Amino acid sequence: MNILITNDDGLTSNGIIAARNSVEDLGQTTLVAPLTQQSGVGHAITLMKPLRAIKTELSDKTYGYAVTGTPTDCVILAVKSIMDKKPDLIISGMNIGENLSRSITTSGTLGATFEAASFGIPAIAVSLQVNREDLKFRTGVNFIDYSHAESIVNKLAKKVIKHGMPEGVDILNLNIPANPDSDEIIQSNFADRMFSTDVEKRIDPYGHPYYWIVGDLIDDGIEGTDVHTLHILNQPAVTPISIDMDAQVNISKWLD
């Protein structure tokens, strides 16, 4: 069993070590992740410049490959060049912070799994809720306790390895509370939104405007959604994803 581990927080994030720890008893793991923070890049691919994959020592004295590109680039390089054999499973994470609702399309964590699915490889996106905003979007060592999350990921990965993906499912999007009430994983639908997106305009010292895209978290109270499961029930939420984007709607009459 060959398992590829990647992320969007970068190779130096402790989250990727936690992801590896969660499945190292299940097979041979290879870590290939971005050199720099890539949160929010979605399924972006690098086409206009060359990529490098740098063998790098991690904080626990093991090694991985730091790629000068996006999470999608990491999956492509790993599958087509770095790994001797095509991976049987790809895990993207553990992301520092949730990836919930239909906003997942902007997530680099999910972008890596979209690419995995395009290769026909089962993929699990793993995101861990954190209670401190200053821990998000950082590279390097952090002091998060991943032990409970590791056991939950191990549990789900074992099911994928033993049974394969459920029919029609390409990706499992797993979100884990910072301190879950139990390790019961609850299937949840995507909420409409996770953030109320806004734009903050500022003026630089030369009088020119610049902008930050900002947003506040939305606590969607709709039962059955991933936001509700994570934020209200305080339980791990998994959402099955298919990359078949066909709407399965006949619009021939509309076209007439």
Swiss-Prot record:
Note on cofactor: Binds 1 divalent metal cation per subunit.
Organism name: Methanosphaera stadtmanae (strain ATCC 43021 / DSM 3091 / JCM 11832 / MCB-3)
Lineage: Archaea, Methanobacteriati, Methanobacteriota, Methanomada group, Methanobacteria
UniProt-recorded Gene Ontology molecular function terms: 5'-nucleotidase activity; metal ion binding; nucleotide binding
Pfam family, one: SurE
Record field: catalytic activity: a ribonucleoside 5'-phosphate + H2O = a ribonucleoside + phosphate
One GO CC annotation: cytoplasm
Name of the molecule in the record: 5'-nucleotidase SurE
Signal peptide: none
UniProt similarity note: Belongs to the SurE nucleotidase family.
Annotated positions binding a divalent metal cation: 8-9, 39, 95
UniProt function note: Nucleotidase that shows phosphatase activity on nucleoside 5'-monophosphates.
InterPro entries assigned: SurE, SurE-like_Pase/nucleotidase, SurE-like_sf
EC number of this enzyme: 3.1.3.5
